[in-house]
Amino acid sequence: MHPIAQANGLRVHVFEEGYVRPHWLTLEKHGVNGRSQLPRDPAWYRDQRRVTPPGPPGQPTGYNLYERAFHDIRYRGANTFFATRFPHYRSHRPRNGFFEYSGLAARALRQRQHHRDSDQVTRELLDAGRAYYIFPLQLNSDAQIVVHSPFDSVREAIAKVLTSFASHAPADSWLVIKNHPLDTGLIDYRRHAEQLARELGMAERLRFIDAGHLPTLLDHARGAVVVNSTVGLSALHHRRPLIALGTAIYGMPGLTWQGSLDDFWLHAEAPDMHLYQAFLDYVVHHTQINGDFYTRSGIAMATAGAVRRLEAATHA
């Protein structure tokens, strides 16, 4: 797409879910995530702090998961209904939508139990003052995994983290793996992780949860491991030592551990919060739009913000 646009004298701007959550979406010139042109130089953001005002708080958009699910069902239904008219269309999703819905439905039926289990794990961690690291999973078909990471799958990322943790993390620490809230459940990551943990002799040091209050878990964690999830920004907000195993917009000295994963467990340091605030303010002002893709109110807010952003880019 970019070469075609360039050949015709057109600039490309890309929409994506927000880097900053909640209440924001991303609109960025050229590309997003691993294709973002945001600098990775800490000194650059510190210098920009002099001319960048504090980022405004996002106003609630009215977003809810049911609205998102409604649009997804309409989208999947249209794909199925009109499939014969577009025989060459290929989705980025690996499975038929309604097959994925079966997995989501099964997971939804177990959601109350998932919340009880995660609450029990959280109490177990906090009541005992247990040292632990948190590893939030991402979606297996997400371009963040498929394109912008060194892994072919989430299972491969789990294997990398568990193997390193077993050999190099403090012996008294635990690893908490938190599944993605929108995971379909068609790949049993819990079974995969627990089986590998047994093989590595660390089964008693692993906790896998399908729910849980992420801010609480981050607030008490010794550190966080992500591939390149937006949870990384949340970890920085909570002043947690962080390593990003893939390409991330926040992957720079002062925000993330720049050494190996093996060394992270013992030697990682808390982020530079002045740098984090400088980075966050710049990102909000230059890449984020207050709004969402799914609700009437959120779309109206996003449209107005996008028009202002694009008009400003036109006159720049």
Regions found by a protein language model. Give the residues of each.
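Short, solvent-exposed loop/turn segments at secondary-structure junctions
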Residues: G18-R21, V32, Q138-D142, P181-D183, ...
